[in-house]
């Protein structure tokens, strides 16, 4: 039976860090059970967030890849003090875009991002790993 191959990465504005590794080597790993997991600030229980993540993946994964790859989306956290210059600049740009929209016009999740900007927030929940772990355990 095919050996599993897993790949996970952080979400940055809907794009998945490391996804190009799967795309580049898909022909080599396509006979394996491929598991892709993402981790980001966006709540994966929110259908709008999932649609945004899926939209980003559709831009880089072919229909064959999407059919073959089992996906799991998890929620993480952020500690601004540990961000590098590039990521700090990205977050500052995102903040400016949100501020232009007006606080009251933002979704509650975006308001929370503004409220915690520059600090530390952690949404990790070990229980949310259960579907991923159960899937891995079910593999032959």
Sequence positions of predicted segments:
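Glycine-rich, N-terminal phosphate-binding loop of Rossmann-like dinucleotide-binding domains
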Residues: 7-11
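FMN-binding flavodoxin-like domain, especially the glycine-rich phosphate-binding loop
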Residues: 4, 14-140
């Amino acid at each position: 039976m095919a050996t599993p191959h897993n790949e996970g990465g952080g979400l940055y504005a809907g794009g998945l860090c490391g996804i190009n590794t799967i795309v580049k080597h898909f022909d080599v790993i396509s006979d394996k059970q491929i598991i892709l997991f993402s981790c980001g600030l966006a709540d994966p229980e929110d259908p709008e967030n999932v649609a945004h993540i899926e939209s980003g993946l559709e831009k880089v994964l072919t229909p064959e890849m999407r059919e073959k790859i089992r996906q799991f989306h998890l929620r993480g956290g952020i500690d601004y003090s540990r961000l590098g210059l590039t990521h700090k600049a990205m977050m500052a740009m995102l903040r400016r875009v949100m501020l232009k929209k007006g606080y009251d016009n933002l979704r509650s999740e975006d308001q929370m991002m503004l409220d915690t900007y520059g600090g530390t927030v952690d949404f990790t929940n070990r229980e949310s790993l259960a579907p991923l772990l159960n899937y891995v355990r079910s593999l032959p």
